[in-house]
From Swiss-Prot:
Protein name, as recorded: Transcription factor RHD6
Location of region: Disordered: 1-58, 157-213
Biased composition (Low complexity): 15-27, 191-205
Domain of life (superkingdom): Eukaryota
Protein species of origin: Arabidopsis thaliana (Mouse-ear cress)
Phenotype when the gene is knocked out: Strong reduction in root hair number and density in seedlings. The double mutant seedlings rhd6-3 and rsl1-1 do not develop root hairs.
Higher taxonomy: Eukaryota, Viridiplantae, Streptophyta, Embryophyta, Tracheophyta
């Protein structure tokens, strides 16, 4: 396969035969710039076309081409695309060199830049490689022949990555959007159910009466605790026992004081202690009988 250059002042595209082939594929017409121009007259077009057709029948072949630093739309290959065959560069970098070579099992592709940087793509099928980059000869209405490349044959790595990355990014965005949407609804529903409601205690007459009764009992116990000797220093049960004993003692005292026998008349003789003791016992026994009778009747 022979590729041609559209600039007479630049180095021509030279085709070279692979080590496995013995036939020289270069055309003598490529030595002259005017004859190597693909869009020129009939002589140059026929030479390049014949060399191209001869090279397509070869199974093992390779080519080396050196594109110019300038970008023209009438060149052999479109170098403005986003593929790895893009030679659009700044003026500070030298024009890269691209070489393709084939072997019996496959081919390789690499291009070199002036800064000792090389990029290689290996393990390519030779037949597939030739199908991708081989041009078709077309004839213009003026009778001139030109090279035509189909957009479907251009293989790009950048566009492939760009076509895959938006899908993955879009899937991630849609996934996160779908996952966060139900969670928001769920959280809003839970918060709506768990809102604290104002507690309104009903005005129950029984509850109010029980509350008042407890308050009165507490007040009475506090008063009794103050009346019983040392009532504030003991617990409630002990305080109640002391209060009971104290009340009994007071009852006896009242009965003793109410008996006229224990109080002599003015100028009279005081009673004996034994008499007073017997009188107290009688009072206590009578009070005990009265208490027992009250319990039986109740």
């Amino acid at each position: 396969m022979a590729l041609v250059n559209d600039h007479p002042n630049e180095t021509n595209y030279l085709s070279k035969q692979n080590s496995s082939s013995s036939e020289d594929l270069s055309s003598p017409g490529l030595d002259q710039p005017d004859a190597a121009y693909a869009g020129g007259g009939g002589g140059g077009g026929s030479a390049s076309s014949s060399s191209t057709m001869n090279s397509d029948h070869q199974q093992h072949q390779g080519f080396v081409f050196y594109p110019s630093g300038e970008d023209h739309h009438n060149s052999l290959m479109d170098f403005n695309g986003s593929s790895f065959l893009n030679f659009d560069h700044h003026e500070s970098f030298p024009p890269p060199a691209i070489s393709c070579g084939g072997s019996s099992g496959g081919g390789g592709f690499s291009f070199l830049e002036g800064n000792n940087m090389s990029y290689g793509f290996t393990n390519w099928n030779h037949q597939h490689h030739m199908d991708i980059i081989s041009p078709r000869s077309t004839e213009t209405p003026q009778g001139q022949k030109d090279w035509l490349y189909s957009d479907s044959t251009v293989v790009t790595t950048g566009s492939r990555n760009e076509s895959l990355s938006p899908k993955s990014a879009g899937n991630k965005r849609s996934h996160t959007g779908e996952s966060t949407q139900p969670s928001k609804k769920l959280s809003s529903g839970v918060t709506g159910k768990t809102k604290p409601k104002p507690t309104t205690s009903p005005k129950d007459p029984q509850s109010l009466a029980a509350k008042n009764r407890r308050e009165r009992i507490s007040e009475r116990l506090k008063i009794l605790q103050e009346l019983v000797p040392n009532g504030t220093k003991v617990d409630l049960v002990t305080m109640l026992e002391k209060a009971i004993s104290y009340v009994k003692f007071l009852q006896v005292q009242v009965k003793v004081l109410a008996t006229d026998e224990f109080w002599p008349a003015q100028g009279g003789k005081a009673p004996d202690i034994s008499q007073v003791k017997d009188a107290i016992d009688a009072i206590l026994s009578s009070s005990q009988r009265d208490r027992n009778s009250n319990l039986i009747t109740n």
